[in-house]
């Protein structure tokens, strides 16, 4: 009888310890993921990247225009599905809204092949060291950040977008005339 009581105590302690560890890890992971996360209503973190056409894009140089920032990867099926919607909206709003598609650390040849295959004309840059991705707290792809003409984050969206959503998002950051 003594051995089984001791065994139950060890099992209970082990289960309790595992639960405490799981809770601790969850709290740590949530805090770590929010460290760099941008928040709606706050100024967008400035960044500069050179796109595949060798044009420099700096967020801070776009005061007076809304900016549509899309984080994506060629390996991401939802990213691929939304690209035609983004392309159509870009063509419609490119005179009123700036746009940058930030590829998350893939080879330039892979990215260029994807762009060519899909006929994309909007600016695409590769975040080779994931510095911008980390600064914005991006986890799952795709992720879209909308910044208004004053440099304030208006929306943070993670996940695929429908065509209607893409047009609504672009329209929402068109500066007031």
Swiss-Prot record:
List the record's Gene Ontology CC terms alphabetically: plasma membrane
Main subcellular location of this protein, as a coarse class:
membrane
Report how it sits in the membrane: Single-pass type II membrane protein
Known pathway? Protein modification; cytochrome c assembly
The answer, when asked if Nucleotide-binding is one of the entry's keywords, is: no
Instruction: Name the coiled-coil region(s).
Output: none
Kindly name one Pfam family recorded for this protein. Answer: Redoxin
Report the protein's function. Answer: Thiol-disulfide oxidoreductase which is required in disulfide reduction during c-type cytochrome synthesis. May accept reducing equivalents from CcdA, leading to breakage of disulfide bonds in apocytochrome c; following this reduction heme can be covalently attached.
Q: Which family does it belong to?
A: Belongs to the thioredoxin family. ResA subfamily.
Protein name (Swiss-Prot/TrEMBL): Probable thiol-disulfide oxidoreductase ResA
Q: Which organism is it from?
A: Shouchella clausii (strain KSM-K16)
List the taxonomic lineage: Bacteria, Bacillati, Bacillota, Bacilli, Bacillales
**Gene from which the chain derives:** resA
């Amino acid at each position: 009888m003594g051995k089984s009581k001791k065994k139950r105590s060890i099992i209970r302690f082990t289960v309790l310890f595992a639960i405490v560890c799981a809770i601790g890890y969850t709290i740590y992971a949530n805090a770590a993921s929010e460290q760099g996360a941008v928040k709606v209503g706050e100024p967008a973190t400035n960044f500069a990247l050179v796109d595949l056409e060798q044009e420099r894009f700096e967020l801070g140089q776009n005061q007076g225009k809304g900016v549509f920032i899309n984080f994506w990867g060629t390996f991401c099926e939802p990213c691929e599905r939304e690209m035609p919607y983004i392309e159509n909206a870009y063509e419609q709003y490119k005179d009123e809204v700036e746009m940058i598609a930030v590829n998350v650390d893939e080879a330039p040849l892979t990215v260029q092949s994807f762009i060519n295959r899909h006929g994309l004309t909007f600016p695409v840059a590769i975040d080779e060291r994931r510095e911008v991705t980390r600064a914005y707290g991006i986890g799952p792809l795709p992720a879209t950040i909308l910044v208004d003409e004053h440099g304030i984050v208006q929306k943070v969206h993670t996940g695929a977008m429908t065509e209607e959503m893409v047009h609504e998002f672009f329209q929402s950051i068109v500066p007031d005339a």
